[in-house]
Design a protein with these regions (language model features):
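Short coil-to-beta transitions that initiate beta-strands within beta-rich domains
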Residues: 106, 162-163
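Surface-exposed extracellular loop regions of Gram-negative outer-membrane beta-barrel proteins
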Residues: 140-142, 174-190
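Glycine-rich and polybasic anion-binding loops at the starts of cofactor/ligand-binding domains
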Residues: 169
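Face-selective signature of the C-terminal outer-membrane beta-barrel domain
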Residues: 1-146
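Outer/extracellular conduits and scaffolds centered on Gram-negative outer-membrane beta-barrels
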Residues: 111-115, 157-162
C-alpha cells in the first residue's frame, strides 16, 4: 500500500486544497474441499476441491478545493478517480483427482475506471441555509471470462451518470429546525 496526502491552507482558513492518493496491490489464495458421503450404496461418493487465486490492484485519487466567497457563501469543487484491476483464476477438481476440470475452471479479468467531478455551493442567510450540488461520473467497465475450449464471455460498458444534491434547512428555534433534502446516490460493492 502506498499513500500520498497533501493539504494546502490559504490565508483564509476556510479556503483549502486537499489531495489524497492511495495505491493498493494485493494477492489472494484460497483452497477449499467438500466431500459428500452417501449412505445409499447406489449413489457414488462425491468430492470437490477448488482453488482460487487473484491479483488485485486499486488506485484512488481525490482532489478537493473549497473557497469561501463571503461569510455566507462557500463553493467546493473536486475530482475523483477510482481504478481497480483484478485477475482471478478458479480451478476445480472432482472426485479426488489432481486433474483440473476444464468444464468448470476459468480465468476472469476485470477492469473498472470511475472518473467523477463535482461542484457544490453552500449558503446561509439568517435562519435559512442550504447546499446545492452536482456530481458527474463516467464509468468504464471491462470484464472477460475465459474457459478452455469455450467461447469467452466479455462485457464492455461505459455510462455517464449525474448525481444532483439539494439540502435546505430552516432554524425555527434554538432547539428546532426543519430540513428538506434530495440526493441521488449509488452503492457499489467493493
Amino acid at each position: 500500500t502506498f499513500s500520498l496526502n497533501f493539504q494546502k491552507q490559504f490565508d483564509n482558513p476556510e479556503q483549502e486544497l486537499m489531495i489524497d492518493a492511495n495505491w493498493n496491490i494485493g494477492k489472494h489464495y484460497r483452497e477449499s474441499s467438500q466431500t459428500l458421503d452417501y449412505w445409499n450404496p447406489t449413489m457414488p461418493n462425491y468430492e470437490k476441491r477448488d482453488v482460487s487465486e487473484s491479483d488485485n490492484k486499486r488506485a484512488v485519487v481525490n482532489i478537493n478545493y473549497s473557497h469561501p466567497f463571503f461569510e455566507t457563501l462557500k463553493m467546493e469543487v473536486g475530482y475523483n478517480l477510482n481504478y481497480s484491476n483484478r485477475y482471478s483464476i478458479y480451478d476445480y477438481y472432482l472426485n479426488g483427482s489432481d486433474v483440473r476440470n476444464d468444464d468448470m475452471s476459468y480465468e476472469f479479468y476485470n477492469t473498472e475506471y470511475i472518473n467523477a467531478v463535482y461542484a457544490t455551493v453552500g449558503y446561509s442567510y439568517g435562519k435559512l441555509s442550504g447546499q446545492i450540488g452536482l456530481r458527474g461520473e463516467i464509468t468504464n467497465l471491462n470484464g472477460r471470462k475465459e474457459m478452455l475450449g469455450k467461447d469467452n464471455d466479455s462485457i464492455n460498458k461505459q455510462y455517464t451518470s449525474p448525481f444532483p444534491t439539494l439540502h435546505l434547512s430552516y432554524q425555527i428555534t434554538d432547539m428546532q429546525s426543519a430540513q428538506l433534502s434530495y440526493s441521488r446516490r449509488i452503492n457499489r460493492p467493493n
